[in-house]
Amino acid sequence: MNQDTICAIATAQGGAIGCIRVSGPEAIEITSYIFTPAATNRELGDSKPYTLTFGRIYDGSEVIDEVLVSLFRAPHSYTGENSTEITCHGSAYILQKVLQLLIKNGCRMAAPGEYTQRAFLNGKMDLSQAEAVADLIASSSAATHRLAMSQMRGGFSKELATLRDQLLHFTSLIELELDFSDHEELEFADRSELCQLANNIEKVIARLVNSFNVGNVIKNGVPVAIIGETNAGKSTLLNVLLNEDKAIVSDIHGTTRDIIEDTVNIGGITFRFIDTAGIRETSDTIESLGIERTFQKLDQAEIVLWMIDATNAQAQITQLAGQLLPRCEGKQLILVYNKADLVDNIQNSIPDNFPDNVQSITLSAKKREHIEELQRMLITSAHLPTITQNDVIVTNVRHYEALNNALEAIHRVQEGLTNNISGDFISQDIRECIFHLSDIAGEVTNDMVLQNIFQHFCIG
């Protein structure tokens, strides 16, 4: 248990109501020094857990605010420690004044993520659940919210615990075999049964590893590259999709040189739009670097919006098809015929030599015509599965790397069983697999890794 008591503001600035959280062995006593219940002959320490007490915060004889204080006793609190939460008016002055009074009476300011770190250290959650708290706070779509809730409620942890139990059973059979190797008549499990067990474990770990492809896209946004020649309307479309003037719009060719990225939620899915430099022949060194980055971002995209100026569509398609189509293999490509308001009887057909999965749409980004239709096409093109809170999908790079290491270890186990190698080597690989799975839950994680994880939380 930690021996000091911490405090921090737990709510965002600017609201009508603010909350200060206090946690540690002296949380109730320190709060009592500055808080007087409205009810006479009553102390905060006499309150039952999970109750609210109305009263006033005092600085000496001066009333700072009328507040509500909730009380939690260890181990039945978020951190597993004695805790109080002071709900006051949201004035920045009041919040800072209450913090100063708490610190004056024995608290210290909490470090970023320290409340959740204490919850982890006190066994209230494992490390993967603690990381899910940060993901929940940062969630910006229904899908990211559901995945964070699933992980925070222990869905991922239960999957890992089941795998560890199976691996421990596995290694116990191997080591029993080693302990009684002098008694050839004893057989605890034949190699075919062990192979089947290893195969079952490998399938589960491989499924979790493969789920990262979807999880990473859901968490960070479906990458959508907006490409095309200069002045095709790429920046205008980006501004319309983001509903803000993010990119500079100009009639001058080559205005966009730096890559501009931003995310927006469309239909419960986060899309990460990338406005790129217009592709053209140029002698400008800086513009050439921007075009080079355009192709790099194109390679990273899941969906490609090829902006085509409808007033000169055929020439642009002929000019860029050879450069773009090979790079768009395996991606969702949408031909966006822009500036439809300037052309009569526009042709938005897909050329015969284009792949079958290419889609097309006619719109006017400047006049915001047919933008909703494009948004529907983006949702369909994302090909994301429907996410529920029961789904176990990996979204964290640290988890992905640990699972990859575990998968490599179980592959060595399978190879060892197939080649009938000594149980000593097989047992070692099984234990390595267990180690990597335990690393995800924080059972073997070192202090430097913990510090790196929790320092990315907000204070409070």
Predicted stretch roles:
Residues 23, 90, 241, 276, ...:
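Glycine-rich, N-terminal phosphate-binding loop of Rossmann-like dinucleotide-binding domains
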Residues 273, 307, 336:
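Generic enzyme active-site microenvironment
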Residues 271, 303, 334:
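Short, Asp-centered acidic motifs that coordinate Mg2+ and/or phosphate
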Residues 1-146, 150, 154, 327, ...:
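A glycine-rich (often HGG/GG-containing) alpha/beta subdomain
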Residues 287-311:
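Inter-motif core of Ras-like GTPase G domains
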Residues 53-65, 69-73, 254-282, 300:
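Switch I (G2) and immediately adjacent beta-strands of P-loop GTPase domains
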Residues 108, 270-272, 359:
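Conserved beta-strand segments of alpha/beta enzyme cores
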Residues 2-9, 145-265, 282-284, 300, ...:
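C-terminal-of-GTPase-core extension/linker across diverse P-loop GTPases
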